[in-house]
Amino acid sequence: KISNFPVIFIDADMRIGKPRMDNELMDHANGKFLIWNDSDDFLLPDAIDKLVGLWNNIPNERNNEYLGVMALCSDDNGVMQTLGYGNNKSILDTTFRQLTADHIGDSTVMIRSDLVNNKKFLEVDFLITESCFWQPIFSDLKVILLSDVVKIMDRTAPGSISFGKKMEYNRGKAYAISISDTGYHFSRLDLIKKLWKVTNYWRYSLLGEVGFLKSIGMWSVVSRNPLYLLLYPAGGLLALRDIIKGKVVMTHRDFDHANKSVKMTVTNY
């Protein structure tokens, strides 16, 4: 079907992963806003109208205070995926830092494209959580959350990585923790969750083959508190258990190879 607007098709001759493709997308995007919609998700017919309408309600003189607008997601069984805000019945106007402190899960995000000019997702694995991209850029900006579901996510789609049983993307997980779970967000965790977060960080770092000294320097939480180094053996035991159970997939190795060898093509329609 021929669209009534320009389409840019970006293709790779091998699997290259979401961060690399997202970076290519942002390099070629030329609209006022960016919105992400993965291949196993779909926007409802009025989604764009609702999001743009929400943005247009912000006075022009205050646009620079906001990163954009957000809305809720559910799966195809009606189960809310934007955890923490599923019962919210009104529009919420808050800071991105506060929103993400209370928000776990997925949401529909429409952001100002000018905010991500020359910004890049970390290319360290086939997958890295989007929060490690959002947090450094958006934390001090405001966002408006619409209480409507505008996107349906298919969690049963072939190849879905949302709930895989393998230990994959470990390097990406380690980097994501080091960027996202700092300062304000880490301080809000209770003691048990803090200990579990640090233990898993060591686990992911080991499985992702991030060197010991580098993993310390990457995350301010462990570099500033040497006591967290005592949890390194616990992370090592979990990593060893994962290996013995045959759960570990070294996706970062495949990514490193693909990132050096891939050929990208960009076609304008």
Where are the regions a protein language model picked out?
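Glycine-rich, basic loop-to-helix element that forms the pyrophosphate-binding segment
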Residues: 12-29
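Conserved donor NDP-sugar-binding/catalytic core segment of glycosyltransferases
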Residues: 46-83
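The conserved acidic donor/metal-binding loop of glycosyltransferases
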Residues: 38-42
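Conserved nucleotide-sugar donor-binding catalytic segment
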Residues: 82-164
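Acidic donor-binding segment of Leloir-type glycosyltransferases
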Residues: 1-11, 56
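C-terminal subregions of glycosyltransferases and related glycan-biosynthesis enzymes
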Residues: 147-269
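Short aromatic/hydrophobic "clamp" motif used to bind/position activated sugar donors
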Residues: 34
